[in-house]
């Protein structure tokens, strides 16, 4: 089968790899000159299934109001003048109760755990290297309340069979020795030993090269103007004067998927702006060993080989990619506060990207009402974490194989009135 994939970020390239391995003739189209040039370029580097959770959570609406008046707030909102933004925020607000949070987090963890397993299998099979580490994730708490609230997430982890350690402040240095210098600022942490890290752009670039060697065609520097349709099928992809045809089409354009699908499929995917710093390591014993997540500021600090990646924050401001100095100052403040000797912060590279976010935090993976149009987008801050699992899942669905995990509640149909999953959702399916 000829499959055309729109997008060469980590999700699009992973989809191309698994579809090619399933025997399909795959073409990837992207306006950029190479893979992973946008959202996948400089993310936080975490592969953290256990911390897969929606931004829509109990208490967030009240916190959002408080954050409006804080200098280092993790969330900021700026109206972009569109009704779509207002509708999206309203849908997100409706997901901020406990029932929706647990449901959304459950399916996110399911897909993320499965994806981590797929990544491990890919690594074992191909030997792909991407400055990856398997040292786990450590979520840091600065207040007693944060430490106490960890029990809510632990319940989901236990249901999913995800190993964890709840650590008091005095034990944090056992996991991250450099934290011994700042343990007095912390109340404890939640460690997930099975989580991983790695350079997403490096992984995507190398996987794309492997996919090309396996027969995948990459059409870079090729802008997509429109999807053409005839009846209930997509007839081709219009790129200037050229029409590229396939038997199946996969939309993996991230935040740009919504506009490209306008008039065909309504998907609630909105750009969530984030920032990162990439910092050369100064002192090995002052740098992180793996990755930490600061619960207060929602900022991740991740160790690559000789670099530290600091990433986080969320701005609901549309497609504005302006680099704001106050955001850089927040990232610098957090990394200096926790790892004061770790990196040459003054030499950092500052970056911003747009994460494709759904109101419920769960990506949109599956077929649309068009019989040959498939979606693999809306992964938000978890594109790197979920890429391999989403790629394998979309490959299985297009190939007519039964996926290893429940999947019907990942499709865009869940936003339709009266939608009910067709089968029970067992998180343990992520380990099948």
UniProtKB/Swiss-Prot annotation:
It comes from the Bacteria. The keyword Oxidoreductase applies. Keywords: FAD, Flavoprotein, Oxidoreductase. Its EC number is 1.4.99.-. It catalyses: a D-alpha-amino acid + A + H2O = a 2-oxocarboxylate + AH2 + NH4(+). The keyword Transferase does not apply. Gene3D superfamilies: D-Amino Acid Oxidase, subunit A, domain 2 (3.30.9.10), FAD/NAD(P)-binding domain (3.50.50.60). Its cofactor is FAD. Transmembrane segments: none annotated. It holds the Pfam family DAO. HAMAP family: DadA. This is D-amino acid dehydrogenase. It comes from Klebsiella pneumoniae subsp. pneumoniae (strain ATCC 700721 / MGH 78578). The lineage of its organism: Bacteria, Pseudomonadati, Pseudomonadota, Gammaproteobacteria, Enterobacterales.
